[in-house]
Amino acid sequence: MLMLCPVVFIALQRVTAGYGMMYSKKWGPSVGNRAGWIMMEAPAFLAMLALWLLSARRWNPAPMVMCLLFLIHYFHRSFIFPLRMRGNSRMPLAIVLMGMTFNVVNAYLIGAWLFYVSPDDRYPASWLTSPLFLLGIVVFIAGMAINIHSDSVIRHLRKPGDTRHYIPRGGMFRFVTSANYLGEFVEWTGYAILTWSLGGLIFALWTFANLAPRARRIHERYLKEFGKEYSCLGRRYILPFLY
């Protein structure tokens, strides 16, 4: 899977996923955005929960804490984020199924490693005070904060019934077009550090490979719609000052 990351990154430079502001009926049957997000994200939450509760290691402090961080993220994405959405946008079922597969596979890779595959002494209780865990959890929390704040900014751009696009401002939007995607990438980079695992690394790289091309598409869309008003802001796509 690690080797597929550059393939996905290159492929998505040419294919635009038809959801959100890029929604297209060409992607086939669709469902409401709220239902789509729940269908796409909740299976990962349930998969990790099952892997945890069925494991003999379920009460080991370090794996349990790392699992809970994963579950907190996916509980928010599955049950809080969708219910706070505004408007009546739709999401193609094809996108829902692809996203569901991506999320469940990553949940399995991480959960299987934490509770079944890793050596019994890989994550002692002292791991929770190790430099890697402490650095990782700071990065993880920072990424989550950026993601949640950026989603809130986007959500409040429109009043009920308004379908126009507006330029998001404030927070990390001062530096990038897709601050919400930046937050998600930072979050999973932190998770890769705090677990120090191949599964965590794969998830972080897959997140970037999936979101970076979309951030570029959104940037191009803003430039087309807003012209100099947007270009003068000097924002990058997803990584401040870099990309």
Where are these regions (language model features)?
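Membrane-helix and juxtamembrane interface regions of eukaryotic multi-pass membrane proteins
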Residues: M1-T101, Y243
